[in-house]
Design a protein with these regions (language model features):
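Short, solvent-exposed helix-loop connector elements
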Residues: 214, 339, 347-354, 369-386, ...
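Active-site-adjacent bridging/hinge elements
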Residues: 115, 364-371
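Conserved nucleotidyltransferase catalytic core and NTase-mimicking acidic/glycine-rich helix/loop elements
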Residues: 398-428
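An anionic, glycine-rich sequence signature occurring as long contiguous blocks
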Residues: 11, 146-171, 175-179, 227-231, ...
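Hydrophobic alpha-helix feature that most strongly marks membrane-spanning transmembrane helices
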Residues: 355, 359, 368, 372, ...
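Conserved, well-structured functional cores that handle cations and Mg-NTP chemistry
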Residues: 2-204, 208-235, 242, 249-271, ...
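Hydrophobic, well-ordered secondary-structure elements that form the walls
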Residues: 361, 393
Length: 465
């Protein structure tokens, strides 16, 4: 059975790559694209160009290195067309279990040294959990409870970069690229997905995006519902209260139109609102089976109107849900969300969709750990996006395989073997005196002496649930 699964997977992989190849144009790009995708699926520690050249063409590594460098860094094929083809092939596999439930917006960071890689700046890096030198990309994933797939991906170009003509020129940032905030990039992703007719889902975002009122209102204007993380100081009107109407007209000038507040009529922060809720408002809800037990926490929900600058508006905003999480044992609530899901949505459904955002975290984890999303070593705009696009293509195949391989199959399934690297191979920059290649370039090198004899071939484990 294992051998049959492996053979079938290899056959499907060949057909999958053939479809991706069909949208890249020139025939001279076919070989490099195949090899790059294969390299991303190989069991190398590093998925940058040099080690992938060594494992995909061990007898002509130097020539392969140059070929892959040109293909990933300079070739003008369309990232959007490749991602569209991947989406076309993979989404039907994901939807075999259930329709798409969510559109998940988030960003991911890549720690970097120096200042010359495109978009690198001192900014918050989620991978490190702190401010540091890094690149950040904003993505959109389509998800259901079984799987998810990134369908849009773009580097965030900090304002200092967008205004620096010299650095833009050196890294070949396209002329049309201007500074945009991360929420603005996210909105572009969402608009493009709507225009492409992608299967609709609830837009999910954390507080880094959800606190942006314009983003939330723009998502609603596109006909999408959302669940958006917010901060504890977000101000709202509790159901049954709202801003004061405009002042009575005095009979002179234009009649007043703007809503009002006064000293005794003010909105409340969601944190204060949560602390004042009665005990019966809180409910323990389970939302997903974890590795050892069901995940659960304590939640409350209330209907509110967002108060953000409504004194500059002529009408109150519509009511929406405020969802609050306050785990047992915590001194105060830990998370808050606003949601435009229908008023009759069940409590459990609201929590379930809110927590589905974990899917994009799974995407990022596996894109980085399994197919080398963060391993690109070039400095240019095009190479950064080409590498990410093919990482998503490789990941898309692995996602579709999860939906194809029967549940009774072993936890790991292998189908690609890395060829042995010639003993004469030396990575660029190594000294003639040092006759040992760097460990990360030799996919078969045992890193410690007690691991036993070196194997002739190494098989790549498939991703697993």
């Amino acid at each position: 059975m294992d051998r049959q699964i492996s053979d079938d997977s290899e056959s499907r992989f060949e057909a999958y790559v053939d479809e991706v190849v069909s949208v890249i144009g020139h025939a001279d790009r076919v070989g490099p694209l195949r090899d790059y995708c294969i390299g991303l699926m190989m069991p190398c520690e590093r998925k940058s160009v040099e080690p992938m050249a060594a494992v995909t063409a061990p007898d002509r590594t130097a020539a392969q290195h140059q070929s892959l460098l040109h293909f990933i860094g300079q070739s003008t094929w369309s990232d959007e067309q490749v991602l569209a083809k991947v989406r076309e092939m993979v989404l039907p596999q994901i939807e075999r279990h259930e329709p798409i439930q969510a559109w998940i917006i988030d960003d991911t960071g890549f720690p970097k040294k120096g200042r010359h890689s495109v978009g690198v700046a001192r900014q918050y890096c989620g991978q490190l959990g702190k401010q540091d030198n890094c690149q950040v990309a904003v993505s959109l994933s389509l998800a259901n409870h079984h799987a998810s797939l990134p369908v849009a991906y773009r580097l965030y170009l900090p304002e200092e970069w967008a205004a620096d003509k010299q650095r833009r020129h050196k890294t070949h940032v396209p002329e049309e690229i201007r500074f945009k905030t991360k929420p603005q990039i996210a909105l572009e992703h969402i608009r493009a997905a709507c225009a492409a007719g992608q299967p609709r889902g609830v837009a999910l975002m954390d507080a880094g995006y959800g606190c942006n009122t314009n983003l939330r209102e723009s998502v609603s204007a596109l006909g999408l519902t959302y669940v958006a993380g917010i901060l504890p100081n977000t101000s709202v009107w509790v159901a049954g209260s709202e801003p004061l109407p405009a002042k009575p007209w005095s009979g002179r000038g234009q009649p007043p139109k703007l809503l009002r507040r006064d000293e005794t009529h003010q909105p409340v922060s969601v944190k204060k609102l949560a602390r004042g809720l009665p005990k019966h408002a809180w409910c323990n809800i389970k939302w997903r089976e974890g590795t050892a037990e069901w995940l659960s926490s304590r939640f409350a929900r209330v209907r509110v109107r967002v108060a953000h600058r409504d004194y500059k508006r002529t009408a109150s905003r519509p009511e929406e849900w405020l969802l609050i999480e306050w785990p047992e044992g915590e001194k105060e609530p830990t998370k808050y969300w606003l949601s435009t899901l229908p008023q009759d949505v069940s409590f459990r459904r609201l929590v379930d969709l809110t927590k589905l955002r974990w899917r994009i975290e799974r995407d990022y984890q596996e894109l980085k750990q399994e197919v080398g999303l963060g391993h690109f070593e070039g400095r240019g705009w095009r190479g950064f996006h080409h590498h990410a696009t093919l990482c998503i293509a490789a990941y898309g195949f692995l996602v579709s395989e999860r939906e194809t391989i029967p549940p009774s199959a072993p936890r790991f399934t292998t189908f690609l073997k890395a060829p042995a690297i010639p003993s004469s191979y030396r990575p660029r920059g190594s000294s003639a005196a040092n006759r040992t290649a760097r460990p990360e370039l030799d996919c078969h090198d045992a890193t410690t002496s007690d691991r036993g004899a070196r194997q002739k071939t190494v098989e790549m484990p498939m991703l697993h649930n």
